[in-house]
Amino acid sequence: MGDATHVVRTGRKFEQVLAGAREVFMADGFEGASVDDIARAAGVSKATLYSYFPDKRLLFMEVARHECHRMSEETAARIDSAAPVRDVLNMAAVEIITFLTSGFGLQIYRICVAEAERFPELGQAFYQNGPERGRERLARYFRQACEAGDLAIDDMTMAAEQFSELCKCRLWTRAVFGLQTEFTAEEIAYTGREAVETFLARYGT
């Protein structure tokens, strides 16, 4: 696949291509994923695939962008800014941990790390559409909570990054190194609660 910077993100076949690419990338990784396999999984011709994504890197970045955007929007839709801060943060922590330890989240992370030297734009795209987008949403919520007197934070961006890092404690590390591959809802909830309590010990009022 050659280079391209513009991707048309519309149509049923486009959605088929994304679904097929997601399946193949998750199974074979970025380097191992072939155009033939992606086209077959998507149920489209190679010509159709090329018409959307002349570059495999663009396709991977679009899959990552699409999935991260979907998760971010779903999480945002469930947040009730009028609810108690502890409840909102517990929900956010569970969502973050669930994504980080999911097969998709782990595979995307591993692919970005593996391809970091050759294709640094892969990691950049994932960061911008995943962690960075999520932290921006957290920072906006923290600002609202501070205005309501529920939190006391000077640096919203730093606090958002700290909260995200607290959510990585224990389970994500185990998942990344292959020490544990499945996590119960109770484990995720407990890890989330501990992250929230630690965060509130620093920033709660």
Spans of features found by a protein language model:
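C-terminal peripheral helix-coil segments that are non-catalytic and often amphipathic
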Residues: 1-4, 91, 95, 136, ...
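Basic, helix-initiating cap at the start of DNA-binding domains
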Residues: 1-28, 32-43, 51-58
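Amphipathic alpha-helical segments that line or abut small-molecule/effector binding pockets
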Residues: 19, 86-102, 106-114, 157-161, ...
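Conserved hydrophobic residue
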Residues: 30-31, 122, 151
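Key DNA-contact positions within bacterial/archaeal DNA-binding proteins
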Residues: 47
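Amphipathic alpha-helical linker/stalk segments
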Residues: 63-92, 100, 104, 108, ...
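Amphipathic alpha-helical segments used for helix-helix packing
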Residues: 100-125, 172-177
